[in-house]
Amino acid sequence: MDMGSKEVLMESPPDYSTGPRSQFRIPCCPVHLKRLLIVVVVVVLVVVVIVGALLMGLHMSQKHTEMVLEMSIGGAPETQKRLALSEHTDTIATFSIGSTGIVLYDYQRLLTAYKPAPGTYCYIMKMAPESIPSLEALARKFKNFQAKSSTPTSKLGQEEGHSAGSDSDSSGRDLAFLGLAVSTLCGELPLYYI
């Protein structure tokens, strides 16, 4: 055996590792431009994340609002379909029932008014403070009442002795007990008490 060959085997193996680690290099760019580029990229990413979060929040709040409105109008059977009487006795709430009409709750006077979409008449109904009807129940009641339009109805302000053809609005009656909201909704339309 040749001694020279043993020396070759005793040498350390060649180093195949990479050279010293250097910074991220962009050719032809000075250091201050690299830093500026990194700052701009970080700011853009932060803005994209914030805008995305805001848009998701807006979408979720819109879906939540639509779900609550859908449940209150024609929603799930497990939800409570009654409106609670507000702490404020002078609160008025107005709802549009699709294209069929407008419902107005007057919690101070405990009245519910309904004006159909064509706007030829206005229905008024008294509500009990412990049992305020839901929009769905009111819509059903008013639709049933409209379907039975051949039945005689009592105009508000008419007495039993007056004929059905007399104009009740020109009789000089005071409708202040209805309140400003109901008077504004119904205007000069004939009022029917249900």
Curated annotation (Swiss-Prot):
GO molecular function (one): identical protein binding
Xref: PROSITE patterns: BRICHOS (PS50869), SURFACT_PALMITOYL (PS00341)
Location(s), subcellular: Secreted, Extracellular space, Surface film
Propeptide cleavage-removed residue intervals: 1-23, 59-194
GO CC list: alveolar lamellar body; cytoplasm; extracellular region; extracellular space; multivesicular body
Record keywords, A-Z: Disulfide bond, Gaseous exchange, Lipoprotein, Palmitate, Secreted, Surface film
Stretches assigned to the BRICHOS domain: 95-194
Pfam families: BRICHOS (PF04089), SP_C-Propep (PF08999)
Family matches, as SMART domains: BRICHOS, SF_P
Chain spans, region Disordered: 1-21, 149-170
Disulfide bonds: C122-C186
Role this protein plays: Pulmonary surfactant associated proteins promote alveolar stability by lowering the surface tension at the air-liquid interface in the peripheral air spaces.
Other facts: Pulmonary surfactant consists of 90% lipid and 10% protein. There are 4 surfactant-associated proteins: 2 collagenous, carbohydrate-binding glycoproteins (SP-A and SP-D) and 2 small hydrophobic proteins (SP-B and SP-C).
Official protein name in the record: Surfactant protein C
Organism listed in the record: Rattus norvegicus (Rat)
Classification of source organism: Eukaryota, Metazoa, Chordata, Craniata, Vertebrata
